[in-house]
Amino acid sequence: MPQLDTSTWLIMISSMILTLFITFHLKVSKHYFPTNPEPKHTLLLKNSAPWEEKWTKIYSPLSLPLQ
């Protein structure tokens, strides 16, 4: 029965780990990370919707007159 040749495994695994590290480092270095993240102020941000600018009356089904 032939023996499994494992003499090149160390070089192969080492080069694979080095390649993965380099590619991961290049991918991460292309991303933009903010230096000082700050929370958003919800009071200053106001969404203007058309129904907020004019008064509308909502009729509840229970408050309508009986027919």
From Swiss-Prot:
<dbReference type="GO" id="GO:0015078">
    <property type="term" value="F:proton transmembrane transporter activity"/>
</dbReference>
<keyword id="KW-0472">Membrane</keyword>
<keyword id="KW-0138">CF(0)</keyword>
<keyword id="KW-0066">ATP synthesis</keyword>
<keyword id="KW-0406">Ion transport</keyword>
<keyword id="KW-0813">Transport</keyword>
<keyword id="KW-0812">Transmembrane</keyword>
<protein>
    <recommendedName>
        <fullName>ATP synthase F(0) complex subunit 8</fullName>
    </recommendedName>
</protein>
<comment type="subunit">
    <text>Component of the ATP synthase complex composed at least of ATP5F1A/subunit alpha, ATP5F1B/subunit beta, ATP5MC1/subunit c (homooctomer), MT-ATP6/subunit a, MT-ATP8/subunit 8, ATP5ME/subunit e, ATP5MF/subunit f, ATP5MG/subunit g, ATP5MK/subunit k, ATP5MJ/subunit j, ATP5F1C/subunit gamma, ATP5F1D/subunit delta, ATP5F1E/subunit epsilon, ATP5PF/subunit F6, ATP5PB/subunit b, ATP5PD/subunit d, ATP5PO/subunit OSCP.</text>
</comment>
<keyword id="KW-0496">Mitochondrion</keyword>
<dbReference type="GO" id="GO:0045259">
    <property type="term" value="C:proton-transporting ATP synthase complex"/>
</dbReference>
<keyword id="KW-0375">Hydrogen ion transport</keyword>
<dbReference type="InterPro" id="IPR039017">
    <property type="entry name" value="ATP8_mammal"/>
</dbReference>
<comment type="similarity">
    <text>Belongs to the ATPase protein 8 family.</text>
</comment>
<dbReference type="Pfam" id="PF00895">
    <property type="entry name" value="ATP-synt_8"/>
</dbReference>
<feature type="modified residue" description="N6-acetyllysine; alternate">
    <location>
        <position position="54"/>
    </location>
</feature>
<feature type="modified residue" description="N6-acetyllysine">
    <location>
        <position position="57"/>
    </location>
</feature>
<dbReference type="GO" id="GO:0015986">
    <property type="term" value="P:proton motive force-driven ATP synthesis"/>
</dbReference>
<dbReference type="InterPro" id="IPR001421">
    <property type="entry name" value="ATP8_metazoa"/>
</dbReference>
<feature type="modified residue" description="N6-succinyllysine; alternate">
    <location>
        <position position="54"/>
    </location>
</feature>
<feature type="transmembrane region" description="Helical">
    <location>
        <begin position="8"/>
        <end position="24"/>
    </location>
</feature>
<keyword id="KW-0007">Acetylation</keyword>
<comment type="function">
    <text>Subunit 8, of the mitochondrial membrane ATP synthase complex (F(1)F(0) ATP synthase or Complex V) that produces ATP from ADP in the presence of a proton gradient across the membrane which is generated by electron transport complexes of the respiratory chain. ATP synthase complex consist of a soluble F(1) head domain - the catalytic core - and a membrane F(1) domain - the membrane proton channel. These two domains are linked by a central stalk rotating inside the F(1) region and a stationary peripheral stalk.</text>
</comment>
<keyword id="KW-1133">Transmembrane helix</keyword>
<dbReference type="GO" id="GO:0031966">
    <property type="term" value="C:mitochondrial membrane"/>
</dbReference>
